Amino acid sequence: KTFTLSRRQQKIERTHEKKIRAVDHLSFTAYEGEIFGLLGPNGAGKTTTLRMLATLIRPDEGDAMVDGISVVKQPDQVRKKIGFLTSELKLEEFFTPSALFDFFADLHQMDGALAKQRKQELFARFGIEKFAEVKVANLSTGMKQKVSIVISILHDPNIIIFDEPTNGLDVLTARTVTDFLMELRRQGKTVILSTHIFSLVEKL
């Protein structure tokens, strides 16, 4: 994937090149019941790779298959198969976790009874029950991340793509997220994540 740089970006990157290639000739396979990690420093192309897998940006060349479905030819079908957590996700601060869950459950066309049960399970798993009716603006950074994770997997996808899932979190919240990732693996899910934290990779 190649991006065109503005003059300001060229100055920041200290380059005269007008284009930068973020990802080139990348190939890997992630299996069921596996946590596949992309480890590298900021700017290594991890987020770009995950965004292409999640069909948020289109590769200039080549293709990727998600559960046998092309991200280039059938992006809508791919989105139904995955749960995607991006480090750039900004929750609407005037909504509550409960309202956000209901909104995204409707987007995924979930049955009402199933959505209610799923909300109870996930809110209990991440300790969100007491904050279900609190506006996002009043939540801690860790609680916002928990809500983001719940929203990304509320439709129970088999393929989970997390971009820097523990970035900026306190130790206890990071441990909760790490334990959940291992739980997803035990359930036979495919987990693909990016991180620049080597200790996280060692734990997983």
Question: What residue spans do the PLM features occupy?
Answer:
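Hydrophobic anchor residue at the start of the ABC signature
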Residues: 149
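Catalytic Walker B motif of ABC-type/P-loop ATPase nucleotide-binding domains
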Residues: 160-163
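Helical segment within the ABC ATPase nucleotide-binding domain
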Residues: 175-187
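Helix N-cap at the start of a conserved alpha-helix in ABC-type nucleotide-binding domains
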Residues: 171-173
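Conserved ABC ATPase "signature" region
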Residues: 102, 106, 113-131
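Conserved ABC ATPase signature
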Residues: 135-139
